[in-house]
Amino acid sequence: MKKAIDAVESAIIMDSEESEQLSGVMREFEEKVTAELAKQGVVANLFVGGSVGKGTCLPGIHDVDYFMRFDLKKYGEENISEVCESVLLGIFKDVLRLKGSRDYFRVKINDYEIEIIPVLYIKRINQAQNLTDQSPFHVNWIKKNVKARKNLNFDMRLAKQFFRASGVYGAESWIGGFSGHVTEILVVYYGGFEKLLKAVLKWKDKTIIDVEK
């Protein structure tokens, strides 16, 4: 197993050039948005989500997710999608608005697609007004577990690559597989990639897991 894992290491970790390119795009985006927030007097900040934010992304990724977190007290009764759009239009010529339980947005920098999800900055789950308000908690939960267990983020990448090669990676309807977040949860629950594989062999229909037990 170790030889097989070593053989795919280069396929699941970005090289320095790709990592620097991604960092440069993110830095440019964050600097522009932070400046525009200040210019418009909007009380909000950016929080990196998705696999990039959790440190579990695979090479070749050209999409980054951001949460634009709005002050709960000031914007709790406002349409924060409208505010978010105003900020983005102050920077980018082309801003794609996407429908959701709360509308979100997509912009491009070079060949990178950046999705921006407006959320309320909450400190407790029960303060959420929309499911997306809870999403940063999901990111922090993965990051907490990655920090607590050595090499867990490597195992998450490994599991994603394995599922992808097996044709079961992706929650899209035409795939019907495991999303990136669910893959990460499975690795946390079972304690690593190899343990996950062994558990999969014993799965039955409607296997239920509870990561807090």
Labelled PLM ranges:
Residues 1-61, 71-79, 105-106, 119-122, ...:
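N-terminal regions immediately upstream of nucleotidyltransferase
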Residues 33, 82-127:
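Conserved catalytic core of two-metal-ion nucleotidyltransferases
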Residues 60-64, 110-112:
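A short, glycine/Asx- and small/polar-enriched loop/turn
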